[in-house]
Amino acid sequence: MSRIGKLPIKIADSVKVDIKDNFITVEGKRGKLSQEINSSIRVKIEDNNIIVERAFNDKQTRAFHGLYRSLIFNMVKGVSDGFSKSLTINGIGYRVEQQGNSLFFNLGYSTQFEYVIPEGINIRLDGNTKIAVEGIDKCRVGQVAAEIRSLKVPEPYKGKGIKYDNEVIRRKVGKSGVKK
């Protein structure tokens, strides 16, 4: 039995779960998420809990067991609480501006980068160097944060670039000049 897969998922009072065939829909105060489920996995609701079980015991199904339990848990948490990732821009003259549905980055290049915010994702700016990516789908929030970070990955010498708030940049020592 999968250690993660066997844990029940508690359904909050504000969350509504609907299971039809191999499709689960979770609806809450923040929105609605749907997920198709592999035919080797069974999902049922018992006593205000979601139970994920497997139909077979082969290696692939055991892997799916924990995966789908985690996906459903993230759906329930997302529609009730939501997810967020914070990023910080480090560097002289590096900044971000929001205009409508786009972010414009000045990252030390001669041109600005434009990033169009995808639907279902909210972005808050705190000043011009802090970015908060928020949404109900954990996967999409992480993907958008990774795309923004990839515009200017932090470099190891001065730490200039876009980094996650909890990320530690391993610094390197620069060249040491030889004295004669």
Swiss-Prot record:
Parts of the chain that traverse the membrane: none
Transferase as UniProt keyword: no
One annotated GO molecular function: structural constituent of ribosome
Gene expressing this chain: rplF
Gene Ontology annotations of biological process type: cytoplasmic translation
Protein family per UniProt: Belongs to the universal ribosomal protein uL6 family.
Protein name (record): Large ribosomal subunit protein uL6
PANTHER family noted in UniProt: 60S/50S RIBOSOMAL PROTEIN L6/L9, LARGE RIBOSOMAL SUBUNIT PROTEIN UL6M
Keyword hit for Secreted: no
InterPro entries registered for this protein in UniProt: Ribosomal_uL6-like, Ribosomal_uL6-like_a/b-dom_sf, Ribosomal_uL6_a/b-dom, Ribosomal_uL6_bac-type, Ribosomal_uL6_CS
GO-annotated cellular components: cytosolic large ribosomal subunit
SUPFAM superfamilies linked: Ribosomal protein L6 (SSF56053)
Role: This protein binds to the 23S rRNA, and is important in its secondary structure. It is located near the subunit interface in the base of the L7/L12 stalk, and near the tRNA binding site of the peptidyltransferase center.
